[in-house]
Amino acid sequence: MRILAIGAHPDDIEIACSGTLAKCVQRGDTVIVCHVSSGNLGHVIIPPDELRVIRANEAKKAGAMAGIEVVWGGFDDLEIYDNNREARDKLVDVIRYANPDLIITHDPDDYMPDHTAVAKLVFDASFTATLPNYKCTSRRLAKDDTPAKLTPIYYMDTLAGVNFNPTMYVDVSDTIDLKLQMLECHESQVVWMRDHDGIDFPDMVKTCSRYRGYQCGAEYAEGFRQCQVYLKGTTKRLLP
């Protein structure tokens, strides 16, 4: 299988579903992660232009740990809007490049505007990318306008699981250590979350995985729910 995980910022995927993606790589899947935004505003002290470079390096390091390809959506923080063609076409390009069998992204009811905008853009772009006669106006990755497949969408957990009720779980007990190592590659964000949100970032993520584990009889787990609309459903179990 080819799996595309699309997160708003570098580290969103590591927080919500990197344990699952690591298991996908281990079973032989090709996994591509797209960070839609550069993450350039995620620090109290480091200026945006400098932070953009730091976070790109952190994301590449994290992806390499699990054998995951990392690509970028071409936005900066809080500049992701879900109501214009340019934004949608940037994700059409990513989806046509990846040609996935499954897309994982943010829940539409997540906590901040970049996350909810990405959820809407992925929903729109995943259909648009399948149209043979649709000409993408923002092609950086895909070689041409070859359409992508119709693809199920799974929504990953929200931060701290707020307002999210999983309909499926993945046991990540054997990849939780790798998940935390990938997360800790994002050193700038460990500091940011402590200073801005007042939390111990790795501890929060581990605790949330333990909580989902309690819900499904595993030591650690990640939760997902499927996008239930026409052409997005499937009877198959696609996750490990």
Model-derived features: where do they sit?
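Metal-dependent de-N-acetylase/amidase catalytic core
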Residues: 1-4, 82-240
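Active-site rim/loop-helix segments in enzyme catalytic domains that contact anionic ligands
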Residues: 1-98, 225, 236-237
